A protein has these predicted regions:
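Hydrophobic or amphipathic alpha-helical targeting/insertion segments
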Residues: 64-72, 83-86, 99-157
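Conserved, well-structured core domains of diverse proteins
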Residues: 1-93, 99-103
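A sequence-level detector of short, solvent-exposed, charge-rich linear segments
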Residues: 91-94, 128, 132, 199-200
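Extended aliphatic helical segments
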Residues: 26, 31-34, 116, 122-124, ...
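Membrane-embedded alpha-helical segments and adjacent helix-loop junctions characteristic
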Residues: 106, 134-202
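C-terminal ends of transmembrane helices
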Residues: 39-52, 109-114, 187-188, 192
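Hydrophobic membrane-targeting alpha-helices
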Residues: 8-15, 40, 74-78, 112, ...
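Membrane-helix interfacial "entry" motifs
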Residues: 55-59, 91-95, 107, 163, ...
Length: 202
């Protein structure tokens, strides 16, 4: 509940312009809070079984690990914002923490996708990652130039065209506000009022 209230307050203040922050910070905060709530809401036990049994000990620990990875990766972006903005992409070497949090967030996102959308989308994402890592081995036009693991993690985690791209940008601004407004209308029964008003007008 505390995370949900914090997310609502943060999104409303940033989307309305009451709190002006760089888009990267807004997106990182959005992803960190949403993933943390998701791992609390959809425990690994319920995600793995249609008929949940008592959760094994590792289930709770795995959830905590995923929350730590999600929150830690987002916090790293926020606290090291100046460093990320000043570094030269694909020229400056990545630090050990860059690699650690980047890889951790990728794993957390894949696990969150599995819990919400199932294995199909995870398999598609996994194939895309495998292509990025090993696509240089494919012949002809199917292949691409060699990309080091550091380059892939950098592109996904430290640049604006990876995880923090336009899709998350839309989610962190327009989409979230619409979902919040829709949920508010539903819980306050205002949706039926608007529906009846529309029927009267037409």
């Amino acid at each position: 509940l505390a995370l949900a209230i914090a997310l609502c307050a943060f999104q409303l203040t940033t989307c309305t312009g009451m709190w002006l922050l760089d888009p990267l910070i807004v997106r990182a905060t959005h992803v960190g809070l949403v993933l943390s709530m998701l791992f609390l809401w959809r425990s690994s036990n319920r995600a793995l079984r249609k008929n949940p049994r008592p959760e094994p000990a590792w289930s709770f620990l795995f959830d905590i690990l995923m929350i730590a990875m999600s929150a830690g990766a987002a916090t790293y972006i926020i606290t090291n914002f100046s460093y990320i903005q000043d570094r030269m992409p694909h020229i400056d070497e990545l630090t050990a923490w860059d690699l650690f949090w980047g890889a951790g967030l990728i794993i957390a996102i894949l696990e969150a996708t599995r819990r919400v959308a199932g294995l199909a989308l995870v398999i598609v994402s996994g194939i895309a990652l495998l292509y990025a890592f090993f696509g240089h081995l494919l012949p002809g036009n199917m292949g691409h130039l060699y990309l080091a693991p550091n380059q892939i993690i950098e592109s996904l985690y430290l640049l604006n065209d990876g995880i923090w791209g336009s899709s998350i940008g839309a989610s962190a601004t327009i989409i979230y506000v619409f979902i919040l407004f829709g949920a508010l209308l539903e819980k306050t029964n205002m949706a039926s009022v608007f529906l009846e008003l529309a029927c009267l007008v037409t």
